[in-house]
């Protein structure tokens, strides 16, 4: 019985397997992944602080970004995500979708810079922004799904019952997507910020366009205050064939973005280093 010789062969084999595990490249294997453009409303109503983080008030935009940071860690490798911003009446692509694992740090760094400094106007025509988000997705090579995060606050306000005309080039179901409603049911003052996104006060009733009665004698709205306009966002979602989600916790957003209806079958880099590693450990037991 040549036990020492056998043990040395086992150790050499285990060492070879460990080296293979260390240098083994990732193989592309078909799996369920996701492809998104996430568009953030960066208008001033999104600065309303009606979320709470451990007793500290948090703005709608900051809560949305924090939820997206958490969601990024939940998406499987091979998934792709890009960023966009909505202000005035347009949704603009900021970052074309990239793979989430290889580009995680860059995605986080760019996400942190999506804020009010990107505003070029104080108007907020959310309905038009939703339609533009469809155009953005259609103009992107992979035709990604859309996540549109907004409180639905229209400025200037819409006349009650007035429809938002749908452009001819946008049709229901052209792309898949989800409108995510940010904010609470309570109407709160809208912070006023400068070009560097520094707070300089709050908007007052005389600073903004208000709806008035047909005879011009009564103010019918409080457009200097903002709450989540959920019925409006749900109606917009229905017009373009999107789903709707109210933004509560990061977990709820991650679950919605991992929903099977948004999954795509695509080759994705997959680690198999655990195979030689497991064999090496088995030899050493």
Where are the regions a protein language model picked out?
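Short beta-strand-loop
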Residues: 80-113, 136-137, 255-256
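Solvent-exposed loop/turn segments at secondary-structure junctions
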Residues: 44-45, 88-91, 152-155, 183-187, ...
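…and closely analogous acidic/polar surface helices at protein-protein or active-site interfaces
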Residues: 33-34, 46-81, 99-103
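Second-shell loop/turn segments in exported
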Residues: 50-61, 93-97, 114-123, 219-224, ...
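Alpha-helical transmembrane signal-anchor/signal-peptide segments
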Residues: 28-44
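Von Willebrand factor type A / integrin I
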Residues: 171-285
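Exposed acidic/Ser/Thr-rich ligand/metal-binding surfaces
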Residues: 92, 112, 117, 123-178, ...
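C-terminal signal-anchor/stop-transfer transmembrane helix together with its immediate cytosolic
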Residues: 1-32, 258-285
């Amino acid at each position: 019985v040549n036990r020492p010789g056998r043990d040395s062969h086992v150790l050499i084999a285990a060492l070879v397997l460990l080296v293979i595990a260390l240098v083994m490249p990732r193989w592309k294997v078909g799996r369920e992944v996701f492809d998104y453009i996430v568009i953030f409303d960066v208008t001033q109503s999104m600065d309303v602080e009606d979320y709470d983080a451990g007793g500290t008030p948090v703005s709608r935009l900051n809560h949305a970004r924090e939820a997206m940071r958490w969601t990024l860690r939940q998406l499987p490798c091979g998934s792709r995500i890009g960023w966009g911003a909505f202000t005035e009446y347009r949704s603009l692509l900021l970052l074309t979708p990239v793979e989430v694992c290889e580009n995680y740090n860059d995605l986080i760094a760019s996400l942190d810079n999506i804020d009010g400094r990107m505003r070029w106007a104080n108007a907020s025509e959310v309905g038009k922004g939703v339609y533009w988000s469809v155009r953005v997705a259609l103009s992107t090579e992979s035709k990604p799904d859309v996540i549109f995060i907004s409180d639905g606050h229209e400025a200037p306000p819409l006349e009650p019952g007035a429809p938002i005309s749908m452009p001819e080039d946008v049709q229901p179901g052209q792309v898949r997507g989800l409108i995510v409603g940010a904010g609470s049911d309570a109407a709160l003052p809208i912070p006023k910020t400068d070009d560097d996104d520094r707070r300089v006060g709050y908007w007052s009733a005389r600073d903004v366009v208000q709806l008035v009665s047909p005879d011009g004698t009564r103010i019918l709205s409080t457009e200097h205050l903002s709450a989540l306009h959920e019925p409006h966002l749900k109606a917009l979602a229905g017009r373009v064939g999107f789903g709707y989600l109210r933004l509560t916790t990061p977990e709820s957003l991650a679950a919605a973005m991992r929903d099977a209806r948004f999954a795509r079958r695509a080759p994705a880099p997959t680690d198999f280093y655990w195979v030689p590693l497991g064999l090496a450990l088995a030899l050493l037991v």
